Amino acid sequence: MFHGTTILCVRRDGKVAIASDGQVSLEKTVMKNTAKKVRRLGEGQVLAGFAGSTADAFTLFERFEAKLKEHQKNMARACVELGKDWRTDRFLRRLEALLIVADKEKTFILSGAGDVIEPDYGIAAVGSGGPYAFAAARALMAHTQMSARDVVHQSLTIAGEIDIYTNANISIEEL
């Protein structure tokens, strides 16, 4: 089973940034250090990141992008519809991945159970290093004036120093 990762999304001052580490592990072995787990969807208007099985995440990215097109780039509606499909489709129910998606206005976490969660604090984090990145981001948001981009970078750096499944090869996308 592929293990761990860290995806973090932060909103601040009208900007949204999403970041991931680059490590892919298989049991106790690092298989890749430079994986790109965040990307732009919906003609560049939606940011997305995944934790979990890579093949499953690509399947979900494709399904999510199809929902975005179907619902005229209404990200919230696309999330709800993908969540419904995830709960009812036998194939999708077997997928092991979590997604964070964000546009200029909203952020959602899509869980493997088909849940669609809009997180508090303007911060969303998933993966094995998610709790560490989330805590670091909350502290940085409360006690600094750092930009969203700088918060995700510094928070992932901290998570990578704590979580063995998170490395310091950070990819960031921003709107």
UniProtKB/Swiss-Prot annotation:
Its EC number is 3.4.25.2. GO terms for cellular component: HslUV protease complex; proteasome core complex. Its main location: cytoplasm. Gene3D superfamilies: Glutamine Phosphoribosylpyrophosphate, subunit 1, domain 1. It is an enzyme of class 3 (hydrolase). CDD domains: protease_HslV (cd01913). Na(+) binds at residues 160, 163, 166. PROSITE patterns: PROTEASOME_BETA_2. It catalyses: ATP-dependent cleavage of peptide bonds with broad specificity. GO terms for biological process: proteolysis involved in protein catabolic process. Allosterically activated by HslU binding. Keywords: Allosteric enzyme, Cytoplasm, Hydrolase, Metal-binding, Protease, Sodium, Stress response, Threonine protease. GO terms for molecular function: metal ion binding; threonine-type endopeptidase activity. It comes from the Bacteria. It is found in: Cytoplasm. Disulfide bonds: none annotated. It holds the Pfam family Proteasome. A double ring-shaped homohexamer of HslV is capped on each side by a ring-shaped HslU homohexamer. The assembly of the HslU/HslV complex is dependent on binding of ATP. PANTHER family: ATP-DEPENDENT PROTEASE SUBUNIT HSLV, METALLOPROTEASE TLDD. NCBIfam families: ATP_dep_HslV (TIGR03692), PRK05456.1 (NF003964). Belongs to the peptidase T1B family. HslV subfamily. Protease subunit of a proteasome-like degradation complex believed to be a general protein degrading machinery. This is ATP-dependent protease subunit HslV.
